[in-house]
Amino acid sequence: MLLPKHHDTLVGIDSDGCVFDTMTVKQREHFFPAIIRHWGLEACADALRACAAFVNLTSKTRGSNRFPALLHVFELLPDYPGVRVSGATLPATDALRTYVHSGLPLGNPSLQAEVARTQNPELARVLEWSLALNDDIDARMRPVPP
């Protein structure tokens, strides 16, 4: 679809509500390292970064909620080159999958309630990751120039 030109400037809004592409910076500088750290995936870090970049930056799932995106990364990761031979222990995903498909609004408040209700350590780790990720972005995210 071609839009008719009405002005000399076009302002586009990114899928996370930003005028500038902060998503790439957030993913590469914050999300990817946090996943690696919280799940001890250093042995397959390159594959994790490639898989997470595909899911979060270049596929049709770009801009999706962090919890379904994390699940998708963990589901695809075993098939990435080098992962199986890396010796990395891949995360269990049953509880995350149940949460993602629960119909609950996906966010830290509902995840906190699910962790309290289920006492599931897998969900607790996801919550720890999500909260630490928010703290890291708040503390270290630099403004992205236009």
Regions found by a protein language model. Give the residues of each.
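Short loop/turn motifs at secondary-structure junctions and domain boundaries
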Residues: L2-P4
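Acidic active-site catalytic centers that drive phospho-/nucleotidyl reactions
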Residues: D14-D16
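Alpha-helical substrate-recognition element adjacent to the catalytic core
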Residues: H6-H7, C18-P146
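Hydrophobic "anchor" residues on beta-strands that sit immediately upstream
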Residues: L10-G12
